[in-house]
């Protein structure tokens, strides 16, 4: 066999002779023969190879150019990737086991390698292969090395890449340290530094100490000292040795709020193993600085500790501490021991604190940026909204001075304590100031310039913390609003700003000398800057950004006091004005601001050494302009301080017995709430949320497992507010008690709930008898009920007894807080089994211990229906799914209904994919699934501020509304409660008797209705498609007229008689429907109700012959929704009606007066158009009108306990595919059990399967709640109020749930006390979201009589979950086309009646923001001078009327100038309000604010 060299020799010699292919082949053979014979020498081979290759290279170079275009190199040649290619080739050979000369073995795993490669990268292998016995071995076994780590390290040697993960970091660091691969070891140490947390830092420190990782060891020790309070809560601390504990607690650098934490951790460590550790107590207490404890703590806790009493040395330490407290003043300084020296932590991490600002409205939220961890987190909110304030850090407190709260310029001062994570108030300034400058000089706070709401200020004042007072100092020479201030060398500088007198942005700068109390002019900046940020680095003053009218700057100037000159430095990445600036560690941080178009959430950092800017990797959660910025020490346990402090305060003030009842929800854990619920009730501590006490007191604990059952318990959810549970105070019911046990007449409504006793029901109430002790006069019980008895509709709790008012202040909101108003509150989030989980709050172990409250987001998906016997069953009750079963179905898998538990997620639970929208219930074992609940839907909505996002219903059906905490059902229920609100394509001429509505009141004659009638109310639109009954919705909509109803049920058990319930909608409906249904074998009585101006068709009793009729009370306010209906020519004869004054309803059931003929036996209207479900669409202005004028008053009380206002919650059905099939023409011939209607069954021939079905965790398929043929046949209303004992066919839940569970699922609709519409006489307070009584202007009617009726109000769409109303004569809709400034000015005038139809002129906008924005220009129309703050930013001037172009900007009639001004909510920029700026002046923030369409800040 030829060798490789011989084979190559023959080829090269043939190529060198230059012969053809034939000769080459022959020569090759001869060469091989020659080589074989040994006739050719080695030297000639080399020569031949060289000659042949040289000839090839020369010929190819002459004919072909260089393909890569590189220049020919001369001299030394260097290939930068040669080493990389070489190692890649060697790694490939290693993987193929080529030329490997050593095999490394670890735990039986063999890894081939090359000695030369290993020795070149590792000193360990270099020594092994050069001077030891292993150099002559080809198989080496490594002891104590993990084979996975060895494989990774060998690959790193060849590839220079290794991935460090949580799984391999420990073995990798150990092996790298042994093999002396220091770079890999350092990479592992860096990774461990990033993974440090209080639960593992002690172990990582020991690990670093063992392996000699000095940097990691020091870093871990610093971390432990800075997070000592958190570290001692974990098991690693309890497993330390006594020497390790002593080494830790003797450090002077421990960061602890008080020495109590050190003392408590020592006691805890001893108690972990008392017998084995008690003898270490004295040596550990030597390092505890007991003299630094408070005297009360020493006496109450330390001296009484049994461990301390049993040790003589510890007693000496206590005596020493008490002596220290007896010393006076300077005597303490002479008493020097190691235990009297305070700890001095160093190197505390810094956080960037951002307070308030505009986003786009004035907000309360406060964010912190951790510079080390590079992440943002929320801390306690300010007490009130605040922007344009000044911020100062004095001592360890942060002062927010002055500013703007959304309506007023304020002079108040709020103080933030980072340690306690709470806000307090301080002394007010002498003057109101917004856009002021604030700085700290000589331990005093200076407030300079600003704007007081009418003029710019040149005055300044100083706050002396020793005297706790503000006093005026010398005034500046120029008025300056939006001024920046800074302190250099003990002097205060006021930089730029805006002068309202000259209406110019300023370039001038003044300097204040506190020793002489004088201001001096210094060199001006090179550019005019208003709203510039000012910071100081190394005695250099920096002016950052700002604007000159509409021109927003990104340039920066620096002032050197030594030379009195300004110079330009590097520009920022973005144009910014009104940004916060703070200096830290030689860097300048610029936070937020706006670029003239939108608010900015980014943060830029300036380095003076490189004269460059960089952007922080993490941005704020929202863009903020006019925010206050400060750099402070990182608060200890920032997320938990609020809970800890609140726990201590509550502990001291509320429960001397030792049980902690916190005023903050994030202090109470689930277990704590369960264990203390009974004790809290017995002590008189309830659970009502202090932020939303809208419906009276509630002593029923939210988390109690042993609460007394209450059949009529109304449970409701509200995303943004707390859950209001008034269950123990609702009305009783007729019948024999059962699961719906009521409270005996004349008894204290709180007696049984507070004492946690069962609630006995009244014995043997007669048929249809009202339970007057609680609900008899507030909501009528359906008359004519048979033996079963009908549940009273409309029961609400009575006013709380006077004795409970004192208890109200001590109520304990265990789980639910108002996220809008209290972001410091945490929320229990029970998830899975067992109840304690990561997201759940952990209770503190003592009055000074820290509870773990890591979850600060809202999750109301918790225990509401505790129905099981075990705690596991009571952790979670399933949430039922809404109509849109195709949405998020697979994501939240459902349990099969047939197994006893239905886990349905809500319609919009995945809107934002937050826990508050998710069904996170645990899946109970099969044996416990019978505890599942099947009742009403849990409706989660989004609040008024988000209404526009749900107006996408294809048929305009409104499904469910949770109004102010009460659960109201309106529209398409698919559960038999009622039909949806119907919109007719055309109206017949027979419906022309509806009262037209003019500008001054109801008209006396009918007028033709124009084609585009956007506000007429058709009575037929509100008749239910399910049997013509809409009592449930009308009961919710018209409580004001139904509140004064009384019950008069007198039907016998056999055949019910008519029950007349004046003014009560629910009673009348229940009288004919539910009352008849309640009879057992008898015939239901006939009920009637006066429905406040709204007629209802007859409803048939399910098991009887009675019917419910309704008459009208003309002129009463109803719940009618104004709609846009497509009119036919015949319908133009019908006069329009008043959306606010109600309609005149027909008096007959024969089809006249606007009602179609009704078949009483079937309970369905005979109008084929109506029966077929031809519908239009509920317009946004109409829905807006309904919210403000109808639903809002129903849930706003008229007594002081009800002042608190709760957000609306609602949602819409996106697709109602059963509207046409659910028409009244189907009648009620076929009765189906409710379970078949809701879920269907496999054996039902007409069951329509869902569009998508997914198996549950048990492998079965759930029955999705979906429109089925059975739903179309269900005609009765008020399903929730049917009798429980012996229900009629089609209404029971046989085989699905127990009566108790059904009772808990009921959704009562409480009535209101008699009285006028609160919204007509009350005004909305924007600051605290409450209603206050207000005067109503007198408006003349057509007859000349004055009536008190306020102008229509409008809900404004905002993003913070609140809403306001303005007293504007706002039309229901806007005309098509762009809305201009002129049209908005016209809104300030009283609208003229439409001569054509006698109604108010209306306009409609296609944009949601226009529909829900308050169109107010009161400030500009007043004729006064514009605000100076707003003038400076280039808003609309009085030189011309602006208009809004296609892009949303406002431009002038003759002049257009693009405004790149502020995007704040009080300024024009949040709506891109770009008005024309005059050439001689610019607009300030507050002047633009007065001219904004949605201005709510005018004073």
From Swiss-Prot:
Gene3D superfamilies attached here?
1.25.40.420, Kelch-type beta propeller, Potassium Channel Kv1.1, Chain A
Name the residue ranges with Polar residues bias: 56-66, 1004-1017, 1135-1147, 1460-1471
Q: Which cysteines bridge via disulfide bonds?
A: none
- Please name the PROSITE patterns in this protein's record: BTB
Q: Residue limits of the BTB domain?
A: 100-166
Which Pfam families does the annotation name?
Answer: BACK, BTB, Kelch_1
Which stretches does UniProt call biased (Low complexity)? 698-713, 986-1003, 1040-1054, 1107-1119, 1401-1410
This entry's Gene Ontology molecular function terms read: actin binding
Keyword flag Phosphoprotein: no
The GO cellular component terms are: cytoplasm; cytoskeleton
The segments carrying the Kelch repeats are 351-396, 397-443, 444-490, 492-539, 541-586, 588-634
Region listing for Disordered, in residue ranges: 56-75, 679-714, 750-786, 825-856, 984-1017, 1033-1085, 1107-1160, 1301-1321, 1334-1499
**What broad class describes the main subcellular location of this protein?**
cytoplasm
- Regions of biased composition (Gly residues) lie at 776-786, 1065-1085
Q: Which UniProt keywords apply?
A: Actin-binding, Cytoplasm, Cytoskeleton, Kelch repeat, Repeat, Selenocysteine
- Quote the subcellular location field of this record: Cytoplasm, Cytoskeleton
Basic and acidic residues bias (residue ranges): 1348-1359
InterPro entries under this entry?
BACK (IPR011705), BTB/POZ_dom (IPR000210), Kelch-typ_b-propeller (IPR015915), Kelch_1 (IPR006652), SKP1/BTB/POZ_sf (IPR011333)
Task: Please name the PANTHER family in this protein's record.
Answer: KELCH PROTEIN, RING CANAL KELCH PROTEIN
Function recorded in the entry: May play a role in organizing the actin cytoskeleton.
Name of the protein described by the UniProt record: Ring canal kelch homolog
Organism for this UniProt entry: Anopheles stephensi
């Amino acid at each position: 066999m030829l060798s490789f060299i011989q084979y190559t020799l023959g080829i090269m010699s043939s190529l060198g002779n230059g012969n053809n292919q034939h000769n080459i082949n022959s020569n090759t053979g001869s060469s091989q023969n020659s080589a074989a014979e040994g006739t050719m020498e080695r030297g000639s081979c080399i020569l031949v190879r060289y000659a042949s290759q040289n000839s090839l290279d020369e010929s190819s170079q002459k004919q072909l150019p260089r393909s890569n275009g590189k220049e020919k190199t001369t001299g030394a040649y260097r290939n930068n990737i040669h080493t990389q290619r070489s190692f890649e080739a060697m790694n490939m050979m290693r993987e193929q086991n080529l030329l490997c000369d050593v095999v490394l073995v670890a735990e039986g795993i063999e890894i081939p390698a090359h000695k030369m490669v290993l020795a070149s990268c590792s000193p360990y292998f270099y020594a092994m292969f050069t001077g030891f016995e292993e150099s002559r071995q080809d198989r080496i076994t490594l002891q104590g090395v993990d084979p996975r780590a060895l494989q990774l390290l060998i690959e790193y040697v060849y590839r220079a890449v290794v991935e460090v993960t949580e799984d391999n970091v420990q073995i990798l660091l150990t092996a790298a340290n042994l093999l002396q691969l220091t770079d890999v070891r350092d990479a592992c140490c860096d990774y461990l530094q990033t993974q440090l947390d209080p639960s593992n830092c002690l172990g990582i420190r020991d690990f670093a100490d063992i392996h000699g990782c000095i940097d990691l060891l020091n870093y871990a020790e610093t971390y432990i000292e800075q997070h000592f309070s958190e570290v001692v809560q974990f098991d690693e601390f309890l497993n330390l040795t006594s020497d390790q504990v002593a080494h830790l607690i003797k450090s002077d650098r421990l960061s602890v709020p008080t020495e109590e934490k050190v003392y408590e951790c020592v006691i805890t460590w001893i108690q972990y193993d008392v017998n084995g550790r008690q003898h270490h107590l004295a040596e550990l207490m030597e390092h505890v600085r007991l003299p630094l404890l408070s005297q009360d703590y020493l006496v109450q806790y330390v001296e009484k500790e049994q461990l301390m009493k049993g040790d003589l040395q510890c007693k000496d330490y206590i005596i020493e501490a008490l002596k220290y407290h007896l010393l006076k003043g300077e005597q303490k300084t002479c008493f020097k021991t190691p235990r009297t020296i305070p700890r001095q932590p160093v190197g505390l991490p810094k956080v960037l604190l951002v307070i308030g600002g505009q986003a786009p409205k004035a907000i309360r939220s406060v964010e912190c940026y951790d510079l080390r961890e590079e992440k943002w987190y929320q801390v306690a909110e300010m007490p009130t909204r605040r922007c344009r304030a000044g911020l100062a850090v004095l001592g360890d407190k942060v002062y927010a001075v002055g500013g703007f709260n959304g309506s007023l310029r304020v002079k108040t001062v709020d103080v933030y304590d980072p340690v306690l994570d709470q806000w307090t108030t301080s002394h007010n300034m002498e003057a109101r100031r917004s856009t002021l400058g604030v700085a700290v000089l000589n331990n005093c706070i200076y407030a300079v310039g600003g704007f007081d709401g009418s003029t710019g200020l040149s005055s300044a004042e100083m706050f002396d913390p020793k005297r706790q007072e503000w006093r005026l100092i010398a005034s500046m020479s120029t008025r300056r609003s939006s001024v920046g201030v800074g302190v250099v060398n003990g002097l205060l500088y006021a930089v730029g700003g805006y002068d309202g007198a000259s209406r110019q942005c300023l370039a001038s700068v003044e300097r204040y000398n506190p020793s002489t109390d004088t201001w001096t002019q210094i060199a001006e900046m090179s550019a005019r800057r208003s709203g510039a940020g000012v910071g100081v680095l190394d005695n250099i003053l920096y002016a950052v950004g700002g604007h000159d009218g509409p021109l927003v700057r990104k340039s920066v100037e620096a002032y050197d006091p030594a030379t009195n000159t300004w110079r330009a430095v590097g520009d920022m990445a973005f144009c910014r004005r009104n940004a916060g600036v703070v200096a830290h560690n030689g860097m300048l941080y610029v936070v937020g601001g706006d670029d003239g178009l939108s608010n900015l959430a980014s943060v830029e950092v300036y380095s003076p050494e490189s004269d460059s800017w960089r952007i922080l990797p993490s941005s704020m959660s929202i863009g903020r302009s006019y925010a206050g910025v400060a750099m402070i020490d990182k608060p200890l346990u920032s997320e938990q301080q609020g809970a800890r402090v609140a726990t201590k305060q509550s502990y001291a003030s509320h429960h001397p017995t030792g049980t902690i009842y916190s005023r903050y929800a994030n202090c109470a854990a689930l277990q704590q709430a369960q264990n203390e619920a009974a004790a809290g009730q017995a002590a008189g501590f309830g659970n009502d949320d202090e932020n939303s006490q809208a419906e009276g007191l509630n002593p029923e604990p939210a988390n109690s497992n042993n609460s007394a059952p209450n059949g009529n318990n109304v449970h409701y959810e509200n995303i943004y507010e707390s859950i209001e549970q008034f269950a123990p105070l609702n009305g009783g019911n007729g019948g024999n008690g059962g699961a719906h046990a009521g409270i005996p007449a004349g008894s204290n409504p709180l007696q049984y709930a507070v004492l946690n006793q069962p609630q006995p029901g009244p014995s043997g109430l007669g048929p249809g008898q009202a339970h007057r002790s609680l609900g008899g006069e507030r909501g009528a019980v359906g008359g004519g009920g048979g033996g079963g008895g009908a549940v009273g509709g409309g029961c609400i709790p009575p006013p709380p007894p006077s004795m409970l008012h004192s208890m109200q202040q001590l109520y304990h909101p265990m789980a639910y807080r108002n996220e809008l108003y209290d972001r410091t509150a945490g929320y229990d989030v029970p998830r899975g089994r067992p109840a304690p989980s990561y997201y759940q709050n952990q209770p503190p172990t003592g009055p000074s211990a820290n509870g773990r409250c890591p979850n600060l987001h809202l999750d109301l998906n918790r225990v509401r229906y505790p129905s099981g016997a075990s705690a596991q069953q009571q952790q979670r009750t399933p949430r039922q799914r809404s109509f849109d079963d195709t949405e998020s179905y697979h994501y939240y898998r459902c349990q099969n209904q047939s197994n006893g538990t239905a886990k349905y997620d809500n319609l919009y639970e995945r809107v934002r994919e937050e826990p508050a929208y998710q069904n996170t219930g645990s899946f109970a074992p099969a044996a416990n699934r019978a505890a599942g609940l099947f009742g009403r839907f849990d409706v989660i909505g989004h609040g008024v501020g988000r209404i526009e996002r749900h107006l996408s219903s294809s048929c305009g059906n409104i499904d469910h509304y949770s109004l102010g905490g009460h659960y109201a059902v309106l529209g398409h229920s698919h559960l038999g409660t009622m039909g949806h609100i119907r919109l007719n394509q055309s109206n017949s001429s027979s419906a022309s008797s509806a009262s037209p509505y003019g500008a001054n009141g109801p008209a006396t004659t009918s007028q033709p209705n124009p084609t585009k009638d956007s506000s007429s109310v058709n009575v037929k639109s509100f008749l239910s498609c399910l049997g013509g009954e809409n009592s449930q919705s009308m009961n919710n909509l018209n409580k004001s007229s139904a509140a004064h109803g009384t019950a008069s049920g007198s039907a016998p058990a056999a055949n019910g008689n008519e029950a007349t319930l004046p003014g009560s909608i629910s009673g009348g409906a229940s009288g004919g429907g539910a009352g008849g249904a309640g009879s057992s074998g008898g015939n239901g009585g006939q009920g009637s109700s006066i429905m406040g101006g709204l007629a209802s068709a007859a409803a048939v009793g399910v098991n009887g012959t009675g019917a419910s009729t309704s008459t009208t009370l003309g002129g009463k306010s109803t719940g009618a929704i104004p709609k846009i209906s497509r009119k036919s020519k015949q319908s133009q004869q019908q006069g329009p009606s008043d959306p606010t004054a109600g309609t005149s309803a027909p008096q007959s059931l024969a089809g006249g007066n606007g009602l179609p003929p009704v078949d009483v036996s079937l309970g369905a209207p005979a109008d084929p158009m109506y029966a077929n479900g031809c519908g239009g669409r509920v317009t946004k202005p109409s829905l807006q009108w309904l919210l403000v004028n109808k639903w809002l008053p129903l849930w706003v009380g008229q007594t002081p306990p009800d002042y608190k206002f709760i957000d609306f919650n609602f949602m819409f059905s996106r697709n109602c595919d059963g509207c046409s099939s659910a028409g009244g023409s189907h009648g009620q011939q076929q009765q189906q059990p409710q379970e078949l209607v809701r879920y269907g069954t496999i054996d039902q021939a007409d069951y329509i399967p869902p569009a998508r079905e997914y198996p549950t965790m048990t492998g079965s398929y759930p029955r999705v709640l979906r429109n089925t043929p059975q739903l179309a046949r269900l005609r009765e209303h008020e399903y929730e109020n049917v009798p429980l004992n012996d229900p009629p066919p089609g209404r029971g839940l046989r085989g699905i749930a127990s009566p108790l569970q059904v009772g808990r699922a009921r959704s009562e609709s409480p009535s209101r006390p008699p009285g006028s519409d609160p919204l007509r006489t009350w005004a909305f307070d924007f600051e605290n979201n409450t209603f206050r009584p207000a005067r109503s202007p007198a408006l003349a009617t057509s007859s000349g009589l004055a009536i008190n009726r306020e102008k229509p109000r409008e809900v404004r769409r905002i993003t913070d979950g609140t809403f306001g109303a303005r007293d504007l004569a706002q039309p229901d809709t806007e005309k098509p086309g762009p809305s201009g400034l002129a049209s908005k000015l016209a809104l300030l005038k009283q609208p003229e009646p439409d001569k054509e139809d006698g109604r108010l002129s209306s306009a409609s906008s296609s944009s949601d923001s226009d529909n829900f924005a308050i169109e107010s220009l009161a400030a500009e129309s007043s004729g006064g001078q514009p605000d100076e703050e707003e003038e400076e930013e280039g808003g609309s001037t009085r030189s011309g009327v602006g208009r809004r172009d296609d892009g949303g900007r406002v431009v002038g009639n003759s002049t257009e100038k693009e405004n790149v001004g502020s995007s704040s909510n009080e300024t024009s920029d949040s709506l891109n309000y770009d008005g024309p700026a005059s050439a001689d002046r610019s607009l300030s923030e507050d002047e633009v604010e007065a001219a904004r369409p949605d201005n709510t800040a005018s004073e």
